[in-house]
């Protein structure tokens, strides 16, 4: 007889997914200082020998193919300062979006040069393997499995000037959301699989006024193994969706569903990059 398992997400869950996350920053000038504005979120992914970032189509459309952008990570081990830049002229992109606001699918992928990907890995970034099936079961007899969901992304309104100033610029603190889903509602819109999420703030004091910046962020399905005492012993993850719009009251987020992610992989990414060979032996991440 199956038993429903209730899991409360806390800070211990952030590590398994936040190391996959990245925010995009668009640079500008204000007087003599450089400015950085959050433009959305993405997830580090890989397929065969191809490395890149999966995000929303409308996020990537705001970034010119020849401009240099900032990449801000939300690592489990926080560095003192980040200043990573990516010249998009050295990348290639595919977009699955018709250009109409709020229409789905709204997905995009931008490749990363191997040198950048390797350096990101060396600094703790983890690339989610799009070529692996994700099926999880308890590793020990008698253990139970539970499922919960979490949304990860940049919150634009939480971006603020940092305390430290520098000769050629200033420090910017970029706020990130790791939000446990209070409700998860899969539905179809014009035949496309979407997921609507309402985030719970029971475990955190900050509630954003909007989800600006979260677009392109991952909706994770977390498969949690619990021992006989109900203690979490393992957390596995599956990319369940990619956020792309918020509700009119700014309380809910809608994500592209898993089938739409599978479609861009099959129809756009694999045909565009010969090195994206899902049949090649790969190590799970």
Residue ranges and their predicted role:
Residues 129-178:
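Short glycine/Trp-rich loop-beta-loop segment that forms part of the substrate-binding cleft
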Residues 66-72, 121-130, 165-168:
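"Short basic amphipathic alpha-helical interaction patches in structured regions
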Residues 204, 236-285:
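C-terminal cap/linker of serine protease catalytic domains
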Residues 1-27, 276-285:
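Non-cleavable N-terminal signal-anchor transmembrane helices
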Residues 14-116, 154, 176, 182, ...:
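Catalytic histidine site
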Residues 205-237:
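Catalytic nucleophile loop of clan PA
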Residues 104-128, 146-147:
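Internal, conserved structured core segments that host functional sites
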Residues 190-206:
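A conserved mid-domain beta-alpha-beta active-site/ligand-binding segment of alpha/beta enzyme cores
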């Amino acid at each position: 007889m199956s038993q429903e398992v209730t899991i409360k997400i806390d800070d211990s869950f952030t590590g398994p997914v936040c190391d996959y996350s990245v925010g995009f920053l668009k640079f500008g000038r204000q007087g003599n200082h450089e400015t950085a504005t959050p433009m959305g979120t993405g997830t580090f992914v890989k397929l065969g020998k191809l490395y890149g970032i999966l995000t929303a189509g409308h996020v990537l459309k705001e970034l010119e193919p020849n401009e240099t952008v900032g990449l801000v990570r939300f690592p489990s081990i926080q560095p003192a300062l980040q200043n990573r830049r990516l010249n998009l002229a050295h990348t290639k992109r595919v977009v699955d979006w018709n250009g109409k606001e709020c229409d789905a699918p709204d997905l995009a992928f931008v490749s990363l040069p191997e040198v950048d990907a390797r350096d990101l890995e060396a600094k703790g970034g983890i690339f989610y393997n799009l070529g692996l099936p994700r099926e999880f079961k308890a590793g020990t007899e008698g253990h139970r499995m539970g499922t919960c969901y979490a949304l990860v992304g940049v919150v634009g309104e939480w971006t603020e000037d940092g305390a430290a100033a520098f000769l050629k610029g200033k420090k910017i603190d970029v706020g990130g959301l790791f939000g446990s889903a209070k409700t998860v509602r899969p539905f179809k819109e014009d035949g496309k699989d979407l997921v609507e999420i309402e985030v719970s703030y029971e475990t955190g004091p900050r509630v954003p006024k909007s989800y600006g910046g979260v677009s392109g962020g991952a909706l994770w399905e977390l498969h949690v193994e619990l021992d006989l005492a109900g203690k979490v012993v393992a957390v596995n993850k599956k990319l369940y969706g990619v956020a792309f719009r918020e509700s009119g009251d700014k309380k809910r987020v809608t994500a592209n569903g898993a089938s739409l992610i599978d479609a861009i992989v099959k129809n756009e990414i694999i045909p565009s990059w010969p090195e994206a060979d899902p049949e090649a032996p790969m190590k799970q991440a």
